[in-house]
């Protein structure tokens, strides 16, 4: 047996940085490079950069600063109702920013959500699928009462009147 060809001995080569950098700058660059653990976290996000203002879960914000060993020990928890509500509000705010003028929204259907006091479990469980809360609210009478959605009739020409924030008709 030759000790030099042992399968346990693995040597990695580190690519050299540009020669015009001083050693201190090269060391700082090396330290800023992501580790495999941080790459796993960033792959779950929608963009390569982690913007702490976009992350609704405060627990995730705190885990980003932890070491990988500390992160391993933590168990994954489901978000609280307050966190779900903020995620839904953030999602609905993004939808309203990209919404068409009022005349065009009638053809797409009513996309109102529940009032802030009533939890909207349909869209909170799937915040990336717009309109699913409306479909589930129409099929479930209890949800219809909570969200103020009237059941659809067979008459396709009937539609709901727009309501203000207190629930009174605007027309």
From Swiss-Prot:
Composition bias, Basic and acidic residues: 19-29
Residue numbers spanned by region Interaction with PPP1R15A: 143-171
Residues modified to Phosphoserine: 43, 46-47, 67
Segments of this protein annotated with the region Essential for activity: 9-12, 42-54
InterPro entries with a match to the protein in the record: PPP1R1A/B/C
Record PTM text: Phosphorylation of Thr-35 is required for activity.
Residue numbers spanned by region Disordered: 1-171
UniProtKB keywords: Acetylation, Carbohydrate metabolism, Glycogen metabolism, Phosphoprotein, Protein phosphatase inhibitor
GO molecular function: protein phosphatase inhibitor activity
Modified residues (N-acetylmethionine): 1
Comp. bias (Polar residues): 122-146
Residues bearing the modification Phosphothreonine: 35
Biological process according to GO: glycogen metabolic process; signal transduction
Pfam families to which the protein is assigned, alphabetical: DARPP-32
Matching PANTHER family: PROTEIN PHOSPHATASE 1 REGULATORY SUBUNIT 1A, PROTEIN PHOSPHATASE INHIBITOR AND DOPAMINE- AND CAMP-REGULATED NEURONAL PHOSPHOPROTEIN
Subunit structure: Interacts with PPP1R15A.
Family, similarity comment: Belongs to the protein phosphatase inhibitor 1 family.
Protein function: Inhibitor of protein-phosphatase 1. This protein may be important in hormonal control of glycogen metabolism. Does not inhibit type-2 phosphatases.
Name of the protein: Protein phosphatase 1 regulatory subunit 1A
Gene: Ppp1r1a
